[in-house]
Amino acid sequence: MKVLIVGSGGREHAIAWKISQNPKVEKIFAAPGNAYNKVIKNCENINLKTSDDILNFALNEKIDLTIVGSEELLVDGIVDKFQKNNLTIFGPNKEAAMLEGSKAFAKDFMQKYGVKTAKYQSFTDKEKAIKYLDEMSYPVVIKASGLAAGKGVVIAQNRKEAEDTLNDMMTNKVFAAAGDTVVIEEFLDGVEISVLSITDSEVIIPFISAKDHKKISEKETGLNTGGMGVIAPNPYYTKTIEEKFIQNILNPTLKGIKEEKMNFAGIIFFGLMIANGEVYLLEYNMRMGDPETQAVLPLMKSDFLDVINSALNKDLKNIKIDWENKSACCVVMAAGGYPVKYEKGNFISGLEKFDINNSDNKVFFAGVKEENDKFYTNGGRVLNVVSIQDNLEKAIEVAYKNVKEISFKDNYCRKDIGTLYVPIKD
C-alpha cells in the first residue's frame, strides 16, 4: 500500500510514524515533508505544494491513500479534486473545511445547530464593527475569520486595543485576506481543552483530550504561536465535562454535518473552553492539531491506519479506539526569535540519542532539514520532544530531561509545559 501524507510539520511526522507501523504500508510519500524521511523507513519526500501538482503525482504513482495535514489545501478543495479523480483521500471536502476556513461560517453553523459557544457578531464593515465595540464588555475577543496559522485571535483588554486590532486586521491587513471579515465575541475566562476526533459523517469518535500551550512565554503570556507544547490527556477533561461536551457540542455538530450533507471522512478538532463549569466551543479545526497530534498519537494503542480506513468505509460505528493508560508531554523546541524573526540553517546536535521507535521517548521533526546526514533548523518551531510515562508529572520531567540532550543555536522552549495544570477530581 502506498500512502501520501500532505504537509511539512511535526504533525505530519507523527502521522507518518504511526501509519508506518501498519505492515500493509510499503511506501510513504511526503509532500513536501521535512527531514523525517531520514528516520522513517521507506519514506520519500516529494517537493510538491499545490493541490494540482499533488493530484497529478497521486494519479501517476497510483497512491492508495492520501492524508492531508495542512489546513490551507483542505480549504482550497484538494479533497474534492481527488474524489473527482476516484482517488481515496482522508479529510474534509471544501464545504466542510469551511468550518475551519471561515470563523464566521463556523459560528453561524454553531448557532444554527445549537452548539454551545460564546456570543458573537461577524463584520465585513469596519465602521460597524467599531460601533459594535460600544456594546461589549472587556476584555473582548477579536478573530480574523480566515486562516491565519493559528495566530489570528486577539484578546483586547479595552476599547482602544479592540479598535486598534480592527484597524490592524481590516485596514492594515496584518493577516491579509483572512482579516477581511472579523468575528467579535465575548471573552470566556477558563481552561482550554483540545479534543481531536474522527468522523465518517455518521458518527464522531473523540480521541483522548489534550492541552495546548499557545503563548510564546511562560504562564501563557506574550505573542500567539502555533503551539509551544501539549499534555495529554488533559487533567481538566473530567467525566462531567466529557458528558457536557458530547451533549452540547459533539452531538449538535454531528446533527449539523448530517443536515448540511457534509459527507466526508476526516478529523474534527474541537477547541473547547471550560468556563464556570460549562463547556463552550471556541473553534473547529478540520485536521489534526499541531502539536496536539504529536502527544495524542503515541498514546493510541489501536492501529491508526485501520481507524482511518474504518472512517473511509463508513464503519466507525463498529470500532473502538483503544488508548494507553499513560500520559504524554510534548515540548516544542523553537528557534530564538520565533514567532517573529528567527534564523534558519543552524546545526542540531543530540538527535542521534533518540529512536523514533522508542515507545517512551520520541523526537518529531518540524522545521528541520537534512544535508549530508546532518540535521539543521529550517523553521520557527523546530522539534517536538515527546515523553510517554505512567503519569503526567513523570512525562513532564522526562520530556524536559530529553530537551537538555538536544542543542542548536539560540534554541528556546517554554519551561512550564503542563506545570500550570494539576489533576482535579470530578
Regions found by a protein language model. Name each.
Residues 153-293:
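Internal nucleotide-binding/catalytic subdomain
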